[in-house]
Regions:
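N-terminal loops that bind phosphate or other acidic moieties
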Residues: 1-129
């Protein structure tokens, strides 16, 4: 199963997004919330993200969803730190809607490209239609 790492500057935001996406995905998901700093402050930590990638990895790849630009930079740093051969993609998607789309695709057995597409299709959602 493709793993998912949710990267937010806020631990609470990452955990809330995780909770919602996990509810949509159902049992057996491989998602990790990697938000905030160890001291509870706002920020992103490449080591925490690296650990999230390793935890979420099941051999089928990992998709990262990040909230802001420096979350993407920390995610890129985490990927650079990987010693294992894990295929990791940072999805270009809004973090909440993208996490839900990715989680649903992963839960039905989607491959890495399908899970990334599930996340990135969130740009096409309209709340008014």
């Amino acid at each position: 199963m493709v793993g998912i790492v949710i990267v937010s500057h806020s631990r609470k935001a990452a955990e809330g997004i995780f909770e919602l996406a996990a509810q949509m995905a159902g049992e057996g998901h491989k998602m990790v919330a990697a938000g905030g700093m160890d001291d509870g402050s706002i920020g992103t930590d490449a080591i925490r993200i690296l650990q999230g990638i390793q935890e979420a990895n099941d051999g089928d790849g990992v998709v990262i969803l990040a909230d802001l630009g420096s979350g993407v930079m920390s995610s890129e740093a985490a990927i650079d730190l990987l010693e294992e051969d894990i295929e990791v993609v940072i999805a270009d998607a809004p973090i909440l809607e993208g996490a839900v789309g990715a989680a649903v695709q992963a839960s039905v057995g989607g491959n890495l490209a399908e899970v990334v597409a599930g996340a990135e299709q969130a740009w096409n959602l309209s709340q008014r239609e």
